[in-house]
Amino acid sequence: MTSSHNNLLQNFQEYLSVEKGLSDNSIYSYGYDLNKFKNFLEKEHIDFLKVQADDIMRFLNEEKDRKISSKTIAREVVAIRQFYKFLKDEKKLDTNPTEKIETPEVMRSIPDYLTQDEIEELFASIKEDNLYELRDKCIFELLYSSGLRISEACNLRLNDMDLEGMTLTVEGKGGRQRLVPFGEKSLDILNRYLKQSRPFILKSRNCEYLFVSKKGSYINRKSVWRLLNHYIKRTSILKKVTPHTLRHSFATHLLENHADLKSVQELLGHIDIATTQIYTHMANKTLREVHKKFHPRG
């Protein structure tokens, strides 16, 4: 049981790093809280994948009995909730056992994003005459111009593309499908990738996935994260940048240019518009900075 529990936790922490772009400290905090929960389950001989809401409540009540602070318990609930949401999205579970557990009030942090100038600097650092770099630029172009999650981009298959209609059929969290448009720049680099880069990398091998690795299979999330870090080092950008930062940038730039919130929600594949609303704070922050810089009463 311990080995399978550790594997699930490791997969979750990789997801937090690669897809959610959390800091090392945040990932450590999630891991610390979930290890406490894991130890409780193993003491009770309960498997992660067979947990019920009552089991979680017994763990939380034990924490209260040990005089653990309410702030720490609230953090533990968030960690457990996010972990089981991840397991459900990964189709390890049919239901999330935390759904009946009251969500504590916690402040959501505003995610980091790149400015439009920083996006251009990043893309300019990638050399399109190198066929591997052409592939990488194509991946980053879709992450930014279509707001894809890194897992969605890595899982794209050739038949998910409609080049004529300039759309992608994307399978998001929980197996939900959505149609995502892309623009002329994406179409141009996709065509060049398909004609030049992809055949060069595959070397006569077959693969159903759009983005391929040297091994002839699909490129994984961790590889894309490493590649993005490599290109960021070529720029003057000092922010921590992950593939998810490009998705944050996509949403922020749409709202800065007055896209309506409902449309952005649909493009991102969010079920709850409250998840999308966090980006309005980011856009409003930019507007405040413009006002302060350029208005005589700023």
From Swiss-Prot:
GO cellular component: cytoplasm; Holliday junction resolvase complex
Any Pfam family hit: Phage_integrase
One of the protein's GO biological processes: chromosome segregation
UniProt KW Ligase keyword: no
Record carries keyword Cell division: yes
Core-binding (CB) domain residues: 3-88
Keyword annotations from UniProtKB, A to Z: Cell cycle, Cell division, Chromosome partition, Cytoplasm, DNA integration, DNA recombination, DNA-binding
Active site (record annotation): 149, 173, 244, 247, 270, 279
Alphabetized GO MF terms: DNA binding; tyrosine-based site-specific recombinase activity
CDD domains: INT_XerDC_C
Quaternary structure and partners: Forms a cyclic heterotetrameric complex composed of two molecules of XerC and two molecules of XerD.
HAMAP family xref list: Recomb_XerC_XerD (MF_01808), Recomb_XerD (MF_01807)
Protein name: Tyrosine recombinase XerD
Gene it is expressed from: xerD
